[in-house]
Amino acid sequence: MKVIKTLSIINFFIFVTFNIKNESKYSNTFINNAYNMSIRRSMAESKPPTGDGAVASAGNGAVASAGNGAVASAGNGAVASAGNGAGNGAGNGAGNGAGNGAGNGAGNGAGNGAGNGAGNGAGNGAGNGAGNGAGNGAGNGAGNGAVASAGNGAGNGAVASAGNGAVAERSSSTPATTTTTTTTNDAEASTSTSSENSNHNNAETNPKGNGEVQPNQANKETQNNSNVQQDSQTKSNVPRTQDADTKSPTAQPEQAENSAPTAEQTESPELQSAPENKGTGQHGHMHGSRNNHPQNTSDSQKECTDGNKENCGAATSLLNNSSNIASINKFVVLISATLVLSFAIFI
C-alpha cells in the first residue's frame, strides 16, 4: 500500500511539472507571435512616403526658372513699375507685352510671389508682348531690361516706344557715363544717351518711310527707354548697330519673326517646370506605401500555411489557444485521476 501511495504521489508531481512546462511553452510562443505581429504592423505603418521627386521639382526646377529670368524682373523692376506707374503706362503703351507682363507679372508677382507671378508675367508677358514689341530685346533680356525700364521711367515713355516704335528700333549699349544729344538733318537717326545706368545709340525711322525726322520723339523715347533696351539687345540674335536707311517698314515683319523664337524660348522654362510642380511623385509613393500592407499580410499568411510558428500571425494564435485548451483539459483529467487514486488509497 505504501508503494502505491508513493507511486501515485510521484505520478502526480510528474504530470503537474510536465503540464506546467507545456503551458509555459505555448504561452511563450503566443506572446512572441503577438509581439512580432505588433512590431511588423508598427514598422509597416511607420514608413512615410518619400517626397524626393516633388522636392527636387519644386526646389530645383521652379527656383531655376524664377531665379534666372523672372526673379530680377519681379523683384527689382516690376515692384517699382507697379508702384510708380507701369500699371497704366506700360499697360496702355506697351500693348500686350508690358500689359500682361507688368500688369500680371508685377501685380501677381509682387502679390503672390515670383513663382506664380513671375512665371506667368515674365514668361507670357515678356515672351509675347516684349518679344514681339521690342523685337528680340526684352524677350531675351527680360531679367535686366524690364527691370530698369519699369524702375526708372515707365510712366509715358514705355507707351510710345514699346507700343509701335520699338519694332523698328535697334539699340546698342556703350559703357560710358557722359550725356550727349545729337540730332541729324538728313532724316536718318537721332542719338541720345542717359547717364543714369548706361548709354544707348538709338535710331528710329518714320513708319511711313518718307524719311522725315522726329528728333523730339526719338530723344524722348531713348531717354525714357534707355534702360529697357540696355541688356536686351546685347542678348538678342540681331546685330548691335544698324543704320536708319535699312530700317524701312518692311523690316518690321522680319523683326517680328525674329521675336517669335524668343517668345518660345522665354515660355519654354514654364513648360518644362510646370509638369514638375504637380507633385505626381508623392502620389506614387503614397499608393506604393498603401499597397505594402496587404503584401505583408499575404506573406504572413504564407508563413502560417508553411507551418512556421515563429513568424505566424493571428491564425496561429487561434491554434495556440486550441492547443492550450486541450492541454488544460488533459491537466484537469490527470489531476482528477490522481486525486481519485489518492483518496481511494488513503481511504
From Swiss-Prot:
InterPro entries: Merozoite_Surface_Assoc, MSA2. It is found in: Cell membrane. Residues 165-308 are annotated as: Disordered. One of its GO terms (biological process) is cell adhesion. Residues 165-206 have a biased composition (Low complexity). Residues 44-273 are annotated as: Polymorphic region. Transmembrane segments: none annotated. The N-terminal region appears to be involved in lipid binding. May play a role in the merozoite attachment to the erythrocyte. This is Merozoite surface protein 2. The gene is MSP2.
